[in-house]
Design a protein with these regions (language model features):
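N-terminal secretory-pathway/extracellular module detecting exported/lumenal segments
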Residues: 27-105, 109-294
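N-terminal secretory signal peptides that target proteins for export/translocation
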Residues: 1-8
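Bacterial N-terminal signal peptides
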Residues: 10-20
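Cys/His-rich metal-coordination motifs, chiefly Zn-binding "fingers/knuckles"
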Residues: 23
Length: 294
């Protein structure tokens, strides 16, 4: 088989999976679903007509939504269904992953907290028969490691039209704060996720990704943390996060300052990051203050 044919089939298979899924969902529940993304395990959709503002407060320019509800759908390939069944620990209910076709869920979103919470979820087979249902889930903050991040962005965009989904997909979503290489060849690089950035008074709050590579270029440490940087004072603190090493895998991030602010010293690589953050906050002030309430 030629390279071109193999490549063409590789592109065609996810598309055929999507085509096979969409008519079934539309025929069974009558909703108009909008496609968000697909990979070899999952296809994500949301129902624009289902989006409702359920709570708001008065702001300077009018009411500001503080709670939004909507419906989302996830389509499963065999591999995606198998992974989902294991994650939900429902193998005793759905024993054959081939049965699980898609799930429809009701979610509640808070734009100010950047959170999404499932209020109900139902799993179906290809004929639309219910396989399993669950009630309210845990409220989760959205970031690059969350499966539901695109759902959150699409629902918020339906109300505010501020480009949440576009920022998730932008080439410059992650910006370099600083990088530094030691004489031994060990290199550290820190990037910031602009899609998560919010300015709360003097603090710029966001999620950051730190990678440490050895002289051979192999990743030996990763930190993924939410941090608050006081821009005028030049201090920062870690709010929460996790840490990975080749020896220990992923672990909760232990911050030696126990959540307290620490000074960003002058002349350090971290100071370059502070300068970058100040420039971003000034240049994109409308973005970092979106959805704020008095």
């Amino acid at each position: 088989m030629s390279t071109k044919i193999r490549y063409g089939l590789g592109l065609l298979m996810p598309f055929l999976f999507l085509l096979a899924l969409c008519p079934t969902v539309l025929a069974e529940d009558g909703r108009a679903w909008t496609w968000l993304s697909s990979n070899d395990k999952y296809s994500k959709f949301y129902a624009p007509a289902s989006v409702r503002v359920t709570s708001s407060v008065a702001g300077a320019g009018g009411s500001v939504a503080t709670e939004i509800t909507g419906e989302i759908k996830t389509g499963f390939s065999y591999e995606g269904a198998d992974e989902t069944i294991r994650n939900y620990k429902i193998g005793h209910v759905i024993q054959n992953p081939g049965q699980l076709s898609y799930a429809v869920a009701q979610v509640r979103v808070s734009p100010q907290k950047r959170t999404l919470q499932y209020t109900g979820e139902t799993f179906y087979d290809a004929a639309g028969h219910v396989l399993w249902s669950k009630g309210e889930g845990t409220e989760k903050e959205m970031n690059s490691q969350q499966f539901d991040e695109e759902f959150y962005a699409a629902i918020v965009d339906m109300v505010f039209h501020r480009g949440e989904l576009a920022r998730l997909r932008a080439d410059d979503r992650w910006i370099l704060l600083w990088s530094d290489e030691m004489a031994s060849g060990v290199k550290t690089q820190v990037t910031a996720d602009t899609s998560t950035m919010r300015r709360v008074r003097d603090n710029l709050v966001f999620w950051a990704w730190t990678e440490v590579r050895n002289a051979d270029g192999k990743v030996v440490e990763i930190k993924f943390d939410k941090r608050a940087v006081n821009l005028p004072q030049g201090t920062e603190r870690i709010v929460t996060g996790k840490y990975w090493s080749s020896a220990g895998g992923w672990q909760p991030l232990e911050d030696g300052y126990e959540g307290a602010y620490r000074m960003i010293a002058r002349g350090t690589p971290e100071e370059r990051g502070l300068v970058r953050l100040r420039a971003f906050a000034d240049g994109y002030s409308t973005w970092v203050t979106r959805y704020q309430i008095p």
